[in-house]
Regions:
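Amphipathic alpha-helical assembly/interaction segments
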Residues: 1-136
Length: 136
């Protein structure tokens, strides 16, 4: 196990993603067992729990580009979940649409974290990639 600030940050993000996935599951369990409720719940359940699993995949990436790719999948899934949560509020598909507000705020924060992580990893990748040389 790593020590220091980067290890704490990694653990914090993993823990946040675990809490986020838990909140998504709890929300979808409270949605109505109607055709629309089931459809939206299933979609949010998939996209809202995916960042937890894909972040784990990113930690075991086979290359820097694989790492960035997996982070981008997390970002894509978070953006999809945000749209689903907004739909839950708009319809509404739960008794109190305001219950979704904390999840939307956390989704926005996680999106910002992943955008920053992707930028940092991409810059690092560009710095560490040696310039290609062509021999004639």
């Amino acid at each position: 196990m790593q020590n220091g600030p980067s290890a704490a940050r990694k653990f914090d993000l993993e823990d946040r993603l675990l809490e986020y996935a838990t909140a998504i599951i709890r929300l979808t369990e409270r949605m109505p067992a109607t055709r629309a409720g089931n459809h939206v719940a299933n979609q949010i359940l998939r996209s809202g729990t995916s960042p937890l699993f894909n972040h784990g995949e990113a930690e075991s990436a086979e290359s820097p580009s694989d790492f960035v790719h997996k982070l981008k999948i997390c970002l894509k899934e978070l953006r999809e979940t945000k749209r689903g949560l907004r739909l839950v509020q708009r319809v509404p598909l739960i008794v109190s649409a305001a219950e979704v507000d904390p999840l939307l705020r956390e989704t926005d924060e996680l999106i910002r974290i992943f955008v920053a992580s992707i930028r940092t990893a991409t810059k690092r990748q560009l710095r560490e990639t040696p310039a290609e040389t062509y021999h004639a």
